[in-house]
């Protein structure tokens, strides 16, 4: 099936369980779809044990997507992610990079608890950091041996950098991080219509019937 950046899909392991996961590949990749799944329970442990050729069921896509074809087009973009929250934004970032001429500058602020928890680090270093017009800011919560980059929480680093408000921000991560990032963006002068975030952590049925996404 085809999807748009920011959408998710239900991944089903027969006889085990099923769960909603963000599709992390760009829609420009027509050959396959990718998921970035952290091993943290029965279903995810099973998915991590799969071998090439094993079969699972996937249905979707579900959820609203980021407006990459209209409201975001031509804009300078600021992506802010924490931990596995980079997963849903990766689809948008790679879509933007695949259609580079349609968008302005790209800033990516990404943090995690430790350097070991930074996902897609190889892609970040070998692709994103080497793309013209893209600036990447990495941070980890605490000092760590071997890490010579920035240390500190994402909301604090956001204030340190002090991004210009001529951007549209897309935010995803732990709820507590999102809360303080949104407050930080407001302090910097970003208006509400300049900020997009996601509620995928509350997603279950994918079609708005179960009510878990109501806030």
Model-derived regions, located:
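Residue-level marker of positions within ordered structural domains that often coincide
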Residues: 28, 159, 215
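Short glycine/proline-enriched turns and hinge-like loops at secondary-structure junctions
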Residues: 3-5, 70-72, 207-208
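Short cysteine clusters
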Residues: 205, 210-213
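FNR/FR-type flavoprotein reductase catalytic core
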Residues: 42-204
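Ferredoxin-reductase
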Residues: 1-54, 112-114, 142
